[in-house]
């Protein structure tokens, strides 16, 4: 009777109905009796129209499965009432993000399965709320990286599946933890073993995969891989290659090679700064100036046979502005290393000694050659990059910036001062027949022949006051074989040389000239021409007048005498133009027979004074 009353009381309270009313309408619930007599509830929700986790999940649920639904996100603390939850399965949903509060209150959780979702990141810090978690399944998601701090929340795991994601590398801290697995706090009776799934990821096979490759070789006895044959995804040359076939080296931070720390170079020279470093992977090399100014040169990169990286800074023509400190940096993902190289650009006071062919350098070309007042070698200086020549110090001029440019020493008769390749013989044959053409007292023109030169061959002209060291350089456009030097001082002796740009002239390409001689020679020629013309005019004018007068007199005589003149065969009296004993010209009378002879002689315009021949004076007569 008492049993019947109890049943009626339970029915009145609706006990059985209330117990099953906790199961969500879109889910199925089941109750299991465990071996120790306790009960475990399992809730399975697989409705494809489900977009959020159900709100009325029984609090005594031990296993919750939300699978193949349209759930995109899990709000924070959704599962906090499920304090008895031990297994949380969320496979093949549309999850793209998880809250860091999602696992709040799940202190007894041992399994968390999230395969087949769209997770790009995972809230690793949320695992601190699950101290008993042993299984984490994240396969078939979109994870691309694992942060180094994740290692602090994975120490107690015995199963971790990261396969079929977008992982390219693993943090070194995590690999080091796996290589030195220790006894877990909840598995103190036996050694911890970790089952690891890393297959089907696009691994980048470089030095950062060195530790993982060695883990696969069995260095960690407590590490078990679901699939041990991992393959490279990149670089392209290693795509598809198994880890077991790789020969990787351990990563190393950049280490600079010792070298020159200070360079002193003359103005206008070419400077090559070189810096080398080692590292794995090969470091990226770069140059910069300590003062922040831009580089005035070209950077080249090289890799030597031993794997060292080299960078070269080429400064073609250094100036005083290039002086300073240059910083070479070698950098890879492990760090950076720097070194400092100081460059000092100076104006040398003495020439640099070179080995050259002995012998006198300068000699004047042509007749009347004059030996130059130089020793075996001439040391000179030139101003680099002067667009137009300026007057030398011998001629007062307005101060100019161009004139204040520093001069550079070079040795004239040393092959290779400007060029390292062409020989002296080749350069000598290039420029031939150098000549000076006069212009004015302040300018001169040079012409030469270059039969072996091409349309792209450019020449340079070096000139200076004879006997001085300071030389100036002019650049001649490619293809031209003449140039005019302006700004010269009048009545001054100069020396000028023509050579292929970048080469040193030899004595065959040099000429000595004087501005007054050039102009005076041309003026003298003009004066001679004028004197010759004047003398010819003076000599030819009197005979011409005499001939005209004689013709006029004959005509008058004809008119007077009529036909008697023809009968006698005589003409008017002729005058003799000869030389008197004192050398002066005189006029005299002659006979008619002598007149006939003179009229048949050569024209008076061609007559000349023949001088004294055979001891007696020879006179020629004109009319």
Curated annotation (Swiss-Prot):
Protein topology in the membrane: Single-pass type I membrane protein
Tissue: Retina, outer segments of photoreceptor cells.
Coiled coil segments of this chain: none
Leader sequence residues: 1-21
Record localization: Endoplasmic reticulum membrane; Cell projection, Dendrite
Lumenal side: 22-526
Alphabetized SMART domains for the sequence: IG, IGc2, LRR_TYP, LRRCT, LRRNT
Glycosylated position list: 156, 296, 455
LRR repeats: 60-81, 84-105, 108-128, 132-153, 156-177, 525-548
Domain LRRCT as annotated: residue spans: 201-253
Gene Ontology CC terms, in alphabetical order: dendrite; endoplasmic reticulum membrane; synapse; synaptic cleft
All ranges on the Cytoplasmic side of the membrane: 548-623
UniProt entry keywords in alphabetical sequence: Cell projection, Disulfide bond, Endoplasmic reticulum, Glycoprotein, Immunoglobulin domain, Leucine-rich repeat, Membrane, Repeat, Sensory transduction, Signal, Transmembrane, Transmembrane helix, Vision
The Fibronectin type-III domain, residue ranges: 430-518
Domain LRRNT: 22-59
Intrachain S-S bonds: 275-328
Stretches that traverse the bilayer: 527-547
UniProt-listed Pfam families: fn3 (PF00041), I-set (PF07679), LRR_8 (PF13855)
Domain Ig-like C2-type: 266-332
Subunit field text: Homodimer. Interacts with LRIT2; may form a heterodimer with LRIT2. Interacts (via its N-terminal extracellular domain) with metabotropic glutamate receptor GRM6. Interacts (via its extreme C-terminus) with the scaffold protein FRMPD2 (via the third PDZ domain); the interaction leads to their colocalization in photoreceptor synapses.
Function field: Photoreceptor synaptic protein essential for normal vision. Involved in synapse formation in cone photoreceptor cells.
Protein name as it appears in the record: Leucine-rich repeat, immunoglobulin-like domain and transmembrane domain-containing protein 1
